């Protein structure tokens, strides 16, 4: 290509082509009908709220109910998908707090190994709630362990 040469981009579709179905967000049923689960699908979507990472010097804990995951699971259930929730912070009884190897953070909740044990073998999508960037170092290790044990799982992370 020469410096003065103009590149003309020609789209492969016409601008008036209706290739995206318009959905009315005010009507959940019409929206869900576009995303319904395949019939007799035994696969599972697992949603996880991992353990909480708390700075050692913190006097408060950001532990809250995983309402976001509950909302997502509710919509997926309504669309016909099989869902499971792992609340790694709320499921651990009695509550145990562990210190990280660098002695800077406390971890509250199930360990990575305990989370791995709770993942349904039929899981094809694993959604993980990553609310705070300060937790990324610990949750990344969890994601790596999940991918190693279940290499075909699609992992979706969000906050």
Pin down the residues of each PLM region.
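A short, structured N-terminal alpha-helical element that caps or precedes a catalytic domain
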Residues: 1-158
